[in-house]
Amino acid sequence: MSNFAIILAAGKGTRMKSDLPKVLHKVAGISMLEHVFRSVGAIQPEKTVTVVGHKAELVEEVLAGQTEFVTQSEQLGTGHAVMMTEPILEGLSGHTLVIAGDTPLITGESLKNLIDFHINHKNVATILTAETDNPFGYGRIVRNDNAEVLRIVEQKDATDFEKQIKEINTGTYVFDNERLFEALKNINTNNAQGEYYITDVIGIFRETGEKVGAYTLKDFDESLGVNDRVALATAESVMRRRINHKHMVNGVSFVNPEATYIDIDVEIASEVQIEANVTLKGQTKIGAETVLTNGTYVVDSTIGAGAVITNSMIEESSVADGVIVGPYAHIRPNSSLGAQVHIGNFVEVKGSSIGENTKAGHLTYIGNCEVGSNVNFGAGTITVNYDGKNKYKTVIGNNVFVGSNSTIIAPVELGDNSLVGAGSTITKDVPADAIAIGRGRQINKDEYATRLPHHPKNQ
């Protein structure tokens, strides 16, 4: 039989105090909705239907082309949300997973175990449950003396006795698809919230003598539903520990994993060393035996093997093998550094390609440049690429030496093996093998300093 999935993502999330739909808030670099969608993939659903509502266009954009969408114009409860999927799923034979889009910590393994449990026990409905010493706010699982599930009771509708129950409803279920939609026709809004509860379907199945079961999570953290910023931070913390643990098991060394922030899609090879307060975001890839020191921040970039990045920022760029960056360097978007390049302290590179073995040791700005191999930039070199309206390109050949405190005004080209004298302002092309000096000639005036107030003779 086929598997189907319904993801509930219509809510506004008032307690988030945000204009962004709740399910689009990010955990470890991707939205909560994307986390849930990826985990749902473990059951290989034939159809996945996502229920949208508040700012539906934003939610649909995230999963465009990956799921079908239905709209819940009025948020009248979880049961009502599932009713919205009726035109797509009613009458199909199979098992349907119903899950909230704000549960980013649920794993694909747990969902696979849940649906296997449901099938193996021939249940018409199976509830994913968890146990906690502090069940306040959760729906409780009410069982009979034979430990069979009788019903789910919400916090606001629970008796004092029922509030003591520690087994809670996680809000995730598997149903026989055909029976689900038949039962939904019989639920009502006779409850404290005046909503259609999906949980009422469980009571209907019990009344008709059909088999209802519960599969209990091994890890309570997976049950976390995010309703406010506090829970969002908790989810981020748990996810970060999972991610870092995975990398450590795969041969990555962390000085302080609790102070290291790595997004879920980051790839790290073995033998990488990561110090504290390192952040790796987006689609970043780190090659083997690279060292990332305290304070390094890398976004959507590729760093090769054997590189050393010291307390620096790299954004949307590529860094080849053996490169040294930092401390306090900034590699801005659309830059590429060739093998063995050295970008030192207080150097900024923007939108530039730099050939292998090139060095810019300190206090340099390289913007909109095409730089060859074995180039040396002296301290204080500035490439001037912007005239207030347009940006221009500088081309620097191989084996070029640029003296300290030089200004290179684009558009200009420095030929192979050329040399720029220290302190020069370059406004014209420099031919290959030439030396360019663009500064005033030094003049010495003998004894002139004796006329000045600072001279000892005038004290």
Curated annotation (Swiss-Prot):
Pathway per its UniProt entry is: Nucleotide-sugar biosynthesis; UDP-N-acetyl-alpha-D-glucosamine biosynthesis; N-acetyl-alpha-D-glucosamine 1-phosphate from alpha-D-glucosamine 6-phosphate (route II): step 2/2; Nucleotide-sugar biosynthesis; UDP-N-acetyl-alpha-D-glucosamine biosynthesis; UDP-N-acetyl-alpha-D-glucosamine from N-acetyl-alpha-D-glucosamine 1-phosphate: step 1/1; Bacterial outer membrane biogenesis; LPS lipid A biosynthesis
Q: Listed GO cellular component terms?
A: cytoplasm; membrane
UniProt: UDP-N-acetyl-alpha-D-glucosamine binding residues: 8-11, 22, 72, 77-78, 101-102, 139, 154, 169, 227, 332, 350, 365, 376
- List where in the cell it is found: Cytoplasm
Which segments carry the region annotation N-acetyltransferase?
A: 251-459
User: Keyword set for this entry?
Assistant: Acyltransferase, Cell shape, Cell wall biogenesis/degradation, Cytoplasm, Magnesium, Metal-binding, Multifunctional enzyme, Nucleotidyltransferase, Peptidoglycan synthesis, Repeat, Transferase
Q: Which residues bind Ca(2+)?
A: 102, 227
Q: Where is region (Linker) located?
A: 230-250
- Protein residues bound to acetyl-CoA: 379, 385-386, 404, 422, 439
Q: Does the keyword Acyltransferase apply?
A: yes
CDD domains, per database record: GT2_GlmU_N_bac, LbH_GlmU_C
Q: Where is this region: Pyrophosphorylase?
A: 1-229
Q: What class of enzyme is it?
A: transferase
Which residues are the active-site ones? Answer: 362 (proton acceptor)
Q: Which reaction does it catalyse?
A: alpha-D-glucosamine 1-phosphate + acetyl-CoA = N-acetyl-alpha-D-glucosamine 1-phosphate + CoA + H(+); N-acetyl-alpha-D-glucosamine 1-phosphate + UTP + H(+) = UDP-N-acetyl-alpha-D-glucosamine + diphosphate
Pfam families assigned to the protein according to its UniProt record, in alphabetical order: Hexapep, NTP_transferase
Q: Which InterPro entries does this entry report, sorted A to Z?
A: Bifunctional_GlmU (IPR005882), GlmU-like (IPR050065), GlmU_C_LbH (IPR038009), Hexapep (IPR001451), Hexapep_transf_CS (IPR018357), NTP_transferase_dom (IPR005835), Nucleotide-diphossugar_trans (IPR029044), Trimer_LpxA-like_sf (IPR011004)
The catalytic activity of this protein is classed by the Enzyme Commission as 2.7.7.23, 2.3.1.157
At the top level, the lineage of the source is Bacteria
How is this protein organized at the quaternary level? Answer: Homotrimer.
- Record-stated family: In the N-terminal section; belongs to the N-acetylglucosamine-1-phosphate uridyltransferase family. In the C-terminal section; belongs to the transferase hexapeptide repeat family.
Q: What is this protein called?
A: Bifunctional protein GlmU
